Amino acid sequence: MASKQRENVFPTRMTLTTMKTRLKGAQTGHSLLKRKSEALKKRFREIVVNIEQAKQKMGRVMQIAAFSMAEVGFAMGNNINFEIQQSVKQPRLRVRSKQENISGVFLPTFEMNLDESIDDFQLTGLGKGGQQIQKARQVYEKAVETLVQLASYQSAFVLLGDVLQMTNRRVNSIEHIIIPRLENTIKYIESELEELEREDFTRLKKVQKTKENAEKADSVTKEEHQGGSNTLQQTKDVGGAIAPAAEVGKEVINEVENSKDDTYSLPSTSTDDEEENDSDEEVIF
């Protein structure tokens, strides 16, 4: 259901720009079609009023024409059709078609042109009924003019009704389908882009934190390595100091041993002398 309410597009910034452009164009088109629909509705109402007036006028004119034709028939008898056909040489009334532009819609209009220079009924009815014939001719000229106007209004009414219906369908489709779908698509793309931005921000934070941890680990390793080097140097220094001390100790021990040897040798010598003296003394006695 959600896919039907928006366009199936890939959420990128280029697509977002395209959708915004399409939305702006749809809103502009909706505004123009709305104005066109209002202009067509106004003209349509005018045509409806003109049709009503033309129909009423047509009813009155045709009623008068029927009475005048009855008067001509009563005055001249049943030969009126034959006499009129024999009198007419050139057409006096001509109907021309034009087009009226209403908001880009071309409506057909009809106009009646009356050529006053042509009068084939001057000698018709000289014997009797000439006045009734002239009156009937004028009445039927008005009837034809009214018919032409009514035909023009009816044609415009039919064509304008179809165009107005089609325009209203377009306006409704743009207003209720196209614009909401584009708006939903834009909201979807913006939400997806925001989600991608949040993911990128989180990813960057993690990368930054990983780099900081790596830098801390490197600094700790360097400190430990530097501390081990200092300890080794101190050990070497202490070892170098111990070696002379050991030599000194050895010398002291040697001196002590030498002193012991000297001390013990002296008493032994005196004892031997005493023994010799005693032996000598014994020998003397």
Curated annotation (Swiss-Prot):
Coiled coil: none annotated. Belongs to the V-ATPase D subunit family. Residues 227-236 have a biased composition (Polar residues). Its main location: membrane. It comes from Schizosaccharomyces pombe (strain 972 / ATCC 24843). This is V-type proton ATPase subunit D. It is a peripheral membrane protein. One of its GO terms (biological process) is vacuolar acidification. V-ATPase is a heteromultimeric enzyme composed of a peripheral catalytic V1 complex (components A to H) attached to an integral membrane V0 proton pore complex (components: a, c, c', c'', d, e, f and VOA1). Subunit of the V1 complex of vacuolar(H+)-ATPase (V-ATPase), a multisubunit enzyme composed of a peripheral complex (V1) that hydrolyzes ATP and a membrane integral complex (V0) that translocates protons. V-ATPase is responsible for acidifying and maintaining the pH of intracellular compartments. The modification Phosphoserine is found at residue 219.
